[in-house]
């Protein structure tokens, strides 16, 4: 028993050495074997137990009887060995197990002063009768033992062995409880003993013994007490010493002494006490009867809140002559362990059968089992014996064998069919023969084997029968032979055993359903009946003994054999294996045992019906029994309790029926403990082997009841609790001189005293919740004692105590009274995540003055302000010693030095560790430890904790504050902290991911800066000019020498010290600036002569490098050298680029071939590129490991690489797990071969984790639920099930109603039962989402997918304290389980991540859906480029290039997983062009060429299906391709290019020299190019598409308001010089390769009526890209035109809103005035807002002014139909003739008929001539073939003679237009005989040009350009994509354009025109015939059908 006090128990000085032999002889004389071990007391260290004589056992105070139902508590005051006034002995927890309704009672007992009792007190006659079955728990104090009162061996006599239980007025007795009050247990005839009934409303009922004067007589019996001490040291030695006869009620203290004579300490080792109690008699039951007859008075009720002793007293109805008493003393020490001392007192029995003494050791954790039957023994309570508190329950359980006689018929009916409501004690204890103890399950009790001994205390046969009846043994068990060997067991699940034959027979019948009625009679009489077996005993006994063939079962309650077993380790039997991943223990299937595989049994209830029914009955009994205690909520405990705490007794695979309260731990462990020793460091979260703090007595705190199973978090409400209440067994490490262990801060001698004891060995509790501590060591500290009066402030710490471990991290369970050391941000993150209560106290963080590598602590006190100190190099690979510093590794804090009076700064969010510059190193470098060890750093101010810049010096920092460091001025100004310094690996020192020993780095102090030079005065320093000292060099004229000295002083490192591998980067301090003149002339010359890039030109990476040439120069100082411009050299840019552009060369894109399919090497190249990219990101994370964006990007790249490597959808889940969840381990699968025991009774595998939902299903619920269903009301049944939280029934009913109801019930279940607070961060939300997704709920309807929930609450960026860390778990959960709404769930999750600006993470979620639709430029797409938000329209150049490459990789991924057609991102084509341009500029011509090939082939495919091709984009691709081909002419072949394949003309420069001119013509153009008639179709594949030349009519007057708005304007395909204008001030829109879009107002603005010589021709609506007509390039200067701010074209997307709106009222009259009035022009301009009128109403007779159309121009077919007035400009016919001239007159004039006949005759003649030419050419071709074949080059060079002839054109006048001249009729008639005179002519096509007046001319009318829009329409801006503007009406008096001044001469002055006459009508047919163009005279150019691609073919 544990006695906790502030003083150590006084040990007796009696030496046992001299009395050893004599006592052993006395034992041998009495025929007592000292090795006979009947009772074993296994003790643990530092716990004291005493066994007092019986006369003082009930001597003091039997009171405090309290019960709520049937539990009694008795306080027993016992004498103390060292009485002290005012000392309160802390009582121990006493728990007793009652099989009836057991409640939890937490009274407290106050044990007052005790004094030695005299013999007069012991002679009182007040005796108390204690019947058999009484269970008493007490606390026995140590009696006073004086040296004079110690008895000698001669004083020991049998008469003194008489012990009496004395009573006085203070004595009290508790109410007793009948042990077996159930009717199922047969009770032999015996006097009835009534129970003492107490009111349950009274919490504490005290029944004093003063009301009764009953005596309990004890007969005079002699007893020999054999005490054997087993001292289990580290070597497991066992020392046996003889026991001592206790005389006169005393025992002497025993000190063990080994053979070597060294005294052993009991507090560090386990001591086992073996006693053999003798018979002890307790007199008659009269006193008990009288005691029970007395009523309970309320006057005797006391309230004692300090009682902690619980005594349960249960008496069974046994015969009075056979009654026995058993005292259970349950002790629960500070470790939470339970110890029980059992003393059995019985009346002596003269005739008893032989019993085999077996010492059964019961685990202290099994306290819920009822008290097993014990044999009758007599115990002599003699002298108290000081022993260690036992850690195991000691029971003298002899394997009682019942008599071989059959019981009488009266006692045969021991079992009934009624299922009892309470459990019975264990059924039997089998006899075991002599076996080797090494084979037992508990070899640790004794290292020597147990020898068989003779039974000294045989039982009486009648008592045997009584035991059998009380225990409910089967009547057939007596028939078992005595030779049956069975291991003794107290396990209730193993209390019943049968033979193998019986087991096999019964099980064979049960499992095969072959239990026939006719076979029942054949079962032998000894066969155990199934109904008898399945009774109140646990059903697991049937499974263990019947269904498993193994006869020898290991005991679950015995610890496994180990070399050094832990004192309180959780006990697991050998047949139970621990599943570490799953955290549950499972029973291993026995060999040959019956198992039910999943293939055979889909459910446990598919087993034989007999087994299932019995199991259901048994489980129902267990639930009814345990439901009584369900009102006590189970405390919220960690999922894995701390290892230092013993597991709850209900956990150890015990049957639930044997567990009083398996739900509530408070019943078993809720009674307050004795106040344990409190240590200053409270809860130690480090491994037990790493720290050994000092143990200090705790200050008793009243009124607090600690919860053993709550986490050790010392919150404000629990700050008074005893901190260390548990102990654990660890491997003790003795501290050596250099030993360093982890330990947190503790208050020390500043306030609590200066004397601190040396550290000693002690066990340190461990917790499974504690973070894994680093293996590195720290300095051992001496923790102080916490005083309740101490203020809760930062304690004063000495320097030695402030040195912190490098490997330790701050505990998350530090109490509030203790101020911890400053924690890093990483530790804050860990603490916030691991603390259950999220306890975050504001840590006093401060920044150290420097990192450890800037100074040496050993030289830390002596400082100089004038001359800086240069410390020696520090090798960090050395072992860190106390007092020295160490380089911190990842997640660690640097060594911190404090002064006694230092006050930490305010808390900072991020406490970074930095490396100072050389200036700080010189400031703090000279530090000596001569005085610092004693006084600390008292001379360092608070400003020293911040980095300091040196004083003002232009060589260091131009803007630094002015200060001085000379003598007398020691002020230093703090500035912002410096960034971390880089080591040789480029990684900051505080973020090393590897051990510092592997990267040995040395740092040297810098040289003396000029500002620390003592020769520099203060005035000079304040002036900001650092001049060299006069003492450096007396020669003032030597500039080189002076500059050299100054440069050397200003250098950051001295010349004699080695430089690091990498310079210091990322420093705020500027490097010293040396003078311009350097002393090193050679280096200067080398620098000046180095080549430098001069300029770069072209898109293909051509760069010009310039060189400097030195030349002699004579100056006043002598000869010098000057550099002049030297030669230049043209090189490739890719050859001179630095490593910064290596990513341009590494990317081997595009990964798609030119045909759009995946390239065969693309996949391997992409994986290689991703691998290099991932390595670069990992290096970047070493610099900044908190960059969330980089981490998300790294995950994205890893997933892309994985998707390319796997290429199989089925393997994605498996390969994705290590990327998203690297630390996750898959739990072991469920056991496929589950035993029947586990299937039917799963309670045996219950865990100790917190219960989230516990609801029992009652019979009333089932009846009412069934009634609802019987009435057909499923809704009411569902509602009732939801109200009662019967989720299985509710979910089943909801599933039968509809899908929405089912989803709602599942959602309700998740909200109610899945407690987020009980689970790890993020698990609750993810589990809720998973369950709802399984119910086919829509992801967008879940409230968990909301930014307001804890799923993505990113207000706090701390990852550990936020549930955002679980988004990867949720992502993997969605992908791994393949939910039906998986894509929608991924979309919603990605949207939430985008809301929090987690772009890479969101895109990763989208990509894992493997749907190409997520990436496009459509409005409903999720993103357009990987890593770029869809709304981010302005990325940088580097970001755009990077995201384009990532998107290309994604395109390749989708192609790999595409099952049908290839995936091609059309929106990526413009970005690919940008990428090609960047690569071409960098010199990567081949990569750029691949992109151009891919884009060109895509455009060729698209142009065949759609006409929505941007001409500007086409020009950019064409120009870039041509330039790439020209730059790669020596190595590339144009025929392999997409551009070469579209051009029919091959490369001819390498064939024949005669073809050089042809090649020049191909490159430079046609030398015969007609400037007056330029070809509108240029070379190239897109010549016909972009054939319109630029409209360069433009002046230098620009509209600032519309500067940024451009219109979609195609440009010409001809040379760029053709589009240039010689006008000064004009803007050329086609000066470069590609011209941007032109402003929509540039066409119409600045164009006056005078200069409207080149009007704008809009495109048609059907084809917005209709080629437009060209105009003269040498146009004259145009006059100004008023600016128009508005337009009636409202749908022009390239115009601002103001330009497409009508003018408001009051805007001024200038907008509505005619143009001629504003500018003084006589012509009046029509208003653009007048109603629409016919074109003839306002258009003048304009002369043709446009350039002639090319007859070979390509005209699409969709513009052939006549254009209406709303679609195109008015035709020349409408301009030339009025509308009435269109009326055809049937009476044609003769002149018109003659003209038509002449035209037809000409056509016929031309056809005949053409036929003749064809025949002639055919003959020539035949003669050429006969002469010999020629090559294909000759065909190219051959000129066709027919081409020189004029081309004959056929006119199709209609279907019936074949005319012939009828001589009779003398006119032309049709072949079908139709009369032409009576037919109306078809509507003619619009003529090209028709002047109104002018003399006839022979020039063809085809030379006239088409008429443009009217003058009023010139102000309207045209758009290729919009319909043509509506022509505006004007007056007839408009001035003709030809009459305007400054108009260019008309090119149609010689055109043939019909005679002008206003008096006659013009025949339209005559106009048509006259408009026929003559044969062209232009030189033929040959076939051009293969020179271009008809992109408008299908349009």
UniProtKB/Swiss-Prot annotation:
Q: What does this protein do?
A: Involved in the initiation of assembly of the COPII coat required for the formation of transport vesicles from the endoplasmic reticulum (ER) and the selection of cargo molecules. Also involved in autophagy.
Gene3D superfamilies, alphabetized: 1.25.40.1030
Similarity field: Belongs to the SEC16 family.
Protein origin, superkingdom: Eukaryota
What are the annotated GO cellular component locations?
COPII vesicle coat; cytoplasm; endoplasmic reticulum exit site; endoplasmic reticulum membrane; ER to Golgi transport vesicle membrane
GO terms (BP aspect): autophagy; Golgi organization; intracellular protein transport; protein localization to endoplasmic reticulum exit site; vesicle coating
Predominant place of localization: endoplasmic reticulum
Residue positions of the PTM Phosphoserine? 790
Q: What is this protein called?
A: COPII coat assembly protein sec16
- Tell me where it resides: Endoplasmic reticulum membrane
UniProt keywords (A-Z) are:
Autophagy, Endoplasmic reticulum, ER-Golgi transport, Membrane, Phosphoprotein, Protein transport, Transport
Q: What is known about its subunit structure?
A: Interacts with dil1.
Q: Name one Pfam family in it.
A: Sec16
Q: Where is this region: Disordered?
A: 1-32, 61-127, 140-198, 349-378, 392-496, 557-594, 629-661, 945-994, 1029-1063, 1605-1631, 1649-1675, 1777-1995
Q: Where is the composition biased (Polar residues)?
A: 61-72, 93-112, 358-367, 393-406, 473-496, 650-661, 1609-1629
What membrane topology does the UniProt entry give? Peripheral membrane protein
């Amino acid at each position: 028993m544990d006695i906790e006090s502030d003083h150590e128990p006084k040990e007796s000085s009696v030496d046992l050495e001299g009395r050893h032999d004599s006592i052993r002889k006395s034992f041998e004389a009495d025929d007592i074997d000292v090795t006979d071990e009947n009772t074993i007391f296994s003790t643990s260290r530092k716990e004291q137990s005493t066994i007092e004589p019986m006369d003082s056992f009930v001597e003091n105070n039997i009171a405090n009887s309290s019960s709520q139902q049937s539990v009694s508590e008795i306080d027993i005051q016992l004498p103390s060995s060292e009485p002290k006034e005012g000392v309160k002995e802390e009582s121990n927890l006493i728990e007793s197990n009652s099989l009836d309704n057991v409640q939890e009672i937490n009274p407290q007992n106050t044990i007052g002063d005790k004094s030695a009792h005299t013999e007069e007190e012991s002679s009182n006659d007040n005796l108390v009768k204690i019947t058999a079955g009484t269970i008493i728990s007490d606390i026995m104090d140590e009696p006073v033992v004086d040296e004079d009162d110690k008895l000698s061996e001669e004083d020991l006599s049998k008469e003194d062995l008489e012990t009496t239980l004395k009573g006085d007025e203070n004595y009290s007795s508790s109410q007793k409880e009948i042990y077996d009050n159930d009717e199922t247990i047969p009770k032999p005839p015996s006097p009835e003993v009534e129970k003492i009934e107490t009111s349950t409303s009274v919490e504490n009922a005290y029944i004093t013994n003063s009301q009764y004067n009953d005596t309990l007589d004890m007969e005079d019996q002699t007893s020999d007490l054999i005490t054997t001490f087993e001292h289990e040291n580290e070597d497991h030695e066992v020392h046996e010493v003889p026991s001592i006869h206790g005389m006169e009620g005393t025992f002497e203290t025993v000190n063990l002494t080994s053979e070597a004579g060294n005294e052993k300490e009991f507090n560090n080792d386990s001591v086992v006490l073996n006693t053999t109690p003798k018979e002890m008699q307790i007199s008659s039951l009269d006193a008990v009867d009288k005691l029970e007859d007395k009523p309970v008075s309320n006057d005797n009720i006391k309230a004692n809140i300090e009682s902690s002793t619980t005594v349960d007293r249960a008496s069974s109805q046994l015969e009075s002559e056979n009654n026995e008493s058993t005292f259970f003393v349950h002790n629960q020490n500070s470790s939470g362990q339970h110890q029980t001392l059992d003393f059995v007192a019985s009346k002596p029995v003269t005739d008893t059968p032989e019993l085999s003494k077996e010492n059964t050791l019961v685990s202290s954790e099994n306290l819920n089992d009822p008290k097993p039957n014990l044999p009758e023994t007599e115990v002599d309570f003699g002298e108290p014996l000081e022993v260690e508190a036992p850690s195991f329950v000691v029971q003298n359980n002899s394997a009682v064998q019942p008599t071989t006689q059959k019981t009488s018929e009266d006692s045969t009916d021991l079992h009934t069919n009624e299922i009892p409501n309470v459990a019975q004690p264990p059924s039997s204890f089998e006899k075991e023969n002599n076996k080797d103890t090494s084979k037992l399950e508990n070899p640790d009790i004794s290292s020597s084997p147990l020898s068989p001994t003779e039974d000294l205390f045989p039982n009486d046969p009648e008592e045997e029968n009584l035991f059998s009846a009380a225990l409910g043994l089967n009547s057939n068990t007596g028939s078992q032979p005595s030779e049956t060997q069975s291991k003794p067991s107290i396990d209730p699940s193993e209390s019943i055993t049968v033979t193998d034959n019986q087991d096999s027979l019964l099980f064979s019948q049960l499992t095969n359903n072959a239990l026939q009625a006719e076979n029942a009679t054949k079962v032998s009489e000894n066969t155990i009946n199934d109904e008898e077996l399945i009774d109140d005993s646990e059903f697991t006994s049937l499974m263990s003994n019947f269904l498993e063939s193994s006869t020898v079962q290991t005991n679950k309650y015995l610890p496994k054999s180990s070399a050094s077993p832990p004192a309180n380790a959780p006990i697991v039997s050998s047949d139970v294996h621990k599943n570490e991943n799953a955290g549950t223990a499972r029973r291993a299937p026995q060999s040959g045992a019956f198992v039910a595989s999943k293939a055979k049994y889909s459910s446990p209830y598919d087993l034989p019906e007999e087994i299932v029914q019995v199991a259901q009955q048994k489980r129902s009994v267990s639930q009814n029994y345990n439901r009584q205690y369900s009102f006590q909520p189970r405390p919220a405990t960690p999922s894995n309790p701390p290892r230092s705490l013993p597991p709850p007794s209900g956990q150890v695979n015990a049957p639930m029926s044997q567990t009083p309260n398996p739900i509530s731990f408070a019943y078993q462990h809720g009674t307050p403990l004795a106040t344990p020793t409190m240590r200053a460091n409270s809860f130690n979260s480090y491994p037990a082997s790493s720290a050994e703090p000092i143990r200090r007595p705790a200050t008793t705190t009243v009124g607090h009841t600690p919860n053993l199973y709550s986490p050790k978090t010392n919150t404000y409400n629990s700050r008074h609790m005893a901190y260390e209440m548990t102990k654990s067994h660890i491997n003790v490490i003795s501290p050596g001189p250099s030993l360093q262990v982890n330990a947190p801060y503790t208050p020390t001698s500043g306030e609590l005293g200066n004397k601190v004891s040396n550290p000693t060995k002690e066990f340190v509790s461990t917790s499974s919740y504690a973070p894994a501590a680093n293996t590195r060591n720290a300095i051992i500290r001496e923790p102080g004692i916490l005083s309740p009066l101490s203020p809760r402030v930062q304690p004063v710490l000495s320097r030695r105590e402030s040195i912190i471990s490098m490997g330790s991290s701050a505990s998350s369970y530090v109490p509030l009274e203790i101020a911890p050391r400053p924690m890093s941000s990483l530790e804050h993150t860990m603490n916030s995540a691991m603390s259950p209560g999220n306890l975050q106290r504001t840590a006093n963080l401060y920044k150290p003055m420097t990192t450890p590598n800037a100074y040496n602590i050993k030289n830390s006190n002596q400082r100089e302000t004038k001359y800086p100190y240069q410390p020696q190099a520090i090798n960090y690979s050395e072992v860190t010693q106390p007092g020295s510093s160490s380089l911190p590794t990842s997640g660690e804090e640097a060594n911190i030095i404090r002064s006694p009076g230092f006050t930490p700064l305010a808390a900072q969010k991020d406490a970074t560790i930095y490396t100072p510059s050389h200036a700080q190193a010189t400031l703090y470098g000279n530090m000596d430890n001569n005085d610092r060890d004693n006084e600390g750093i008292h001379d360092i101010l608070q400003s020293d904790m911040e980095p300091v810049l040196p004083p003002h010096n232009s060589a260091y920092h131009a803007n630094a504050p002015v200060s001085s460091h000379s003598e007398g001025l020691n002020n230093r100004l703090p500035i912002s902290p410096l960034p971390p310094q880089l080591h040789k690996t480029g990684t900051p020192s505080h973020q090393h991911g590897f051990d510092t020993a592997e990267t040995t780095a040395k740092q040297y102090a810098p040289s003396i800066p000029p500002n620390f030079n003592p020769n520099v005065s203060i005035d000079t320093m304040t002036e900001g000019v650092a001049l060299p000292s006069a003492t450096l060099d007396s020669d003032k004229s030597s500039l080189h020498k002076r500059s050299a000295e100054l440069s050397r002083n200003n250098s950051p490192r001295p010349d004699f010290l080695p430089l690091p591998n990498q310079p210091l980067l990322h420093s705020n301090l500027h490097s010293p600036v040396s003078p311009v003149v350097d002393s090193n002339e050679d280096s200067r010359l080398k620098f000046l002569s180095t080549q430098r890039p001069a300029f770069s030109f072209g898109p293909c990476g051509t760069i010009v490098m310039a060189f400097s040439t030195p030349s002699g120069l004579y100056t006043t100082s002598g000869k010098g050298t000057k550099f002049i411009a030297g030669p230049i050299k043209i090189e490739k840019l890719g050859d001179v680029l630095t490593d910064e552009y290596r990513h341009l060369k590494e990317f081997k894109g595009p990964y798609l071939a030119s045909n759009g399919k995946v390239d065969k090497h693309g996949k391997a190249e992409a994986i290689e590129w991703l691998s290099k990219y991932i390595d670069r990101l990992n290096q970047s994370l070493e610099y900044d490991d908190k960059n969330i964006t980089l981490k998300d990007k790294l995950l994205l790249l890893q997933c892309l690489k994985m998707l390319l490597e796997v290429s199989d959808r089925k393997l994605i889940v498996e390969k994705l797990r290590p990327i998203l969840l690297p630390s996750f381990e898959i739990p072991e699968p469920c056991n496929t071969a589950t035993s029947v025991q586990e299937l039917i009774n799963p309670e045996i595998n219950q865990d100790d984790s917190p219960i989230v939902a516990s609801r029992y299903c009652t019979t009333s619920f089932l009846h009412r639920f069934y009634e609802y269903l019987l009435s057909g009301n499923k809704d009411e049944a569902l509602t009732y099930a939801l109200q009662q939280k019967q989720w299985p029934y509710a979910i089943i009913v909801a599933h039968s109603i509809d899908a929405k109801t089912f989803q709602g019930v599942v959602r309700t279940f998740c909200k109610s039962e899945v407690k987020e607070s009980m689970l790890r961060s993020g698990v609750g939300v993810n589990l809720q989402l998973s369950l709802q997704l399984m119910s086919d709920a829509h992801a967008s309807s879940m409230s968990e997918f909301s930014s307001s929930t804890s799923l993505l609450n990113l207000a706090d960026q701390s990852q550990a304290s936020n549930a955002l860390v679980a988004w990867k778990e949720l992502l993997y959960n969605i992908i791994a389980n393949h939910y039906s709404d998986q894509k929608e769930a991924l979309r919603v999750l990605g949207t939430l991540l985008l809301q929090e600006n987690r772009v890479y993470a969101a895109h990763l979620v989208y990509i894992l859906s493997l749907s190409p639709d997520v990436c496009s430029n459509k409005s409903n797409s999720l993103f357009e480029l990987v890593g770029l938000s869809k709304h981010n329209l302005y990325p940088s150049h580097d970001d755009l290039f990077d995201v384009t490459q990532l998107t290309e990789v994604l395109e390749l991924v989708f192609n790999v997983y595409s099952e049908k057609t290839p995936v091609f991102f059309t929106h990526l084509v413009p970005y690919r062009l940008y990428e090609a341009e960047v690569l071409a500029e960098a010199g990567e011509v081949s990569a750029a060429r691949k992109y151009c090939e891919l884009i060109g082939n895509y455009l060729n495919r698209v142009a065949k299906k759609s006409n929505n091709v941007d001409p500007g984009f086409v020009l950019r691709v064409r120009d870039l391709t041509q330039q790439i081909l020209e730059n790669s002419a020596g190595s590339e072949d144009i025929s392999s290019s997409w551009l070469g394949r579209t051009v029919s003309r091959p490369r001819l420069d390498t064939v024949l020299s005669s073809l050089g001119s042809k090649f020049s013509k191909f490159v430079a153009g046609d030398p015969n190019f007609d400037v007056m008639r330029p070809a509108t179709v240029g070379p190239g594949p897109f010549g016909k598409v972009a054939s319109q030349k630029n409209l360069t009519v433009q002046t230098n007057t620009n509209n600032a308001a519309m500067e940024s708005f451009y219109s979609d304007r195609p440009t010409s395909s001809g040379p760029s010089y053709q589009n240039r204008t010689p006008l000064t001030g004009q803007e050329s829109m086609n000066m470069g390769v590609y011209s941007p879009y032109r402003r929509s107002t540039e066409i119409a603005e600045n164009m006056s009526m005078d200069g409207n010589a080149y009007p704008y021709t809009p495109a048609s609506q059907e084809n917005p890209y209709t080629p437009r007509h060209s105009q003269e390039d040498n146009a004259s200067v145009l006059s100004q035109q008023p600016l128009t701010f508005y337009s009636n074209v409202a749908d022009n997307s390239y115009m601002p809103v103001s330009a497409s709106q009508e003018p408001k009222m009051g805007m001024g009259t200038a907008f509505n005035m005619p143009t001629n009035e504003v500018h003084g022009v006589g012509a009046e301009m029509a208003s653009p807002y007048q109603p629409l009128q016919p074109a003839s109403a306002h258009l003048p007779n304009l002369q043709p002014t446009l350039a002639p159309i090319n007859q070979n121009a390509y005209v699409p077919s969709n513009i052939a139909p006549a254009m209406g007035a709303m679609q195109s400009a008015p035709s020349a016919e409408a301009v030339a003739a009025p509308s009435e001239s269109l009326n055809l007159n049937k009476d044609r004039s003769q002149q018109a008929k003659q003209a038509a006949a002449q035209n037809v005759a000409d056509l016929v003649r031309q056809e005949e001539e053409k036929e003749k030419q064809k025949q002639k050419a055919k003959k020539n071709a035949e003669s050429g073939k006969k002469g010999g074949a020629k090559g294909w080059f000759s065909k190219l060079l051959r000129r066709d003679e027919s081409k020189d002839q004029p081309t004959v054109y056929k006119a199709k006048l209609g279907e019936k237009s074949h005319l012939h001249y009828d001589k009779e009729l003398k006119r032309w008639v049709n072949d079908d005989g139709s009369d032409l005179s009576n037919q109306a002519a078809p509507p003619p096509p619009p003529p090209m040009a028709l002047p109104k007046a002018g003399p006839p001319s022979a020039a063809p009318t085809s030379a006239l350009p088409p008429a443009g829009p009217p003058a009023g329409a010139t102000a309207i801006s045209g758009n290729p994509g919009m319909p043509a503007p509506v022509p505006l009406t004007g007056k007839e008096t408009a001035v003709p354009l030809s009459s305007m001044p400054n108009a260019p001469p008309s090119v149609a002055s010689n055109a043939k025109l019909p005679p002008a006459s206003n008096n006659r009508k013009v025949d339209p047919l005559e106009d048509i015939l006259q408009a026929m163009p003559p044969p062209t005279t232009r030189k033929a150019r040959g076939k051009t059908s293969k020179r271009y691609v008809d992109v408008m073919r299908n349009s």
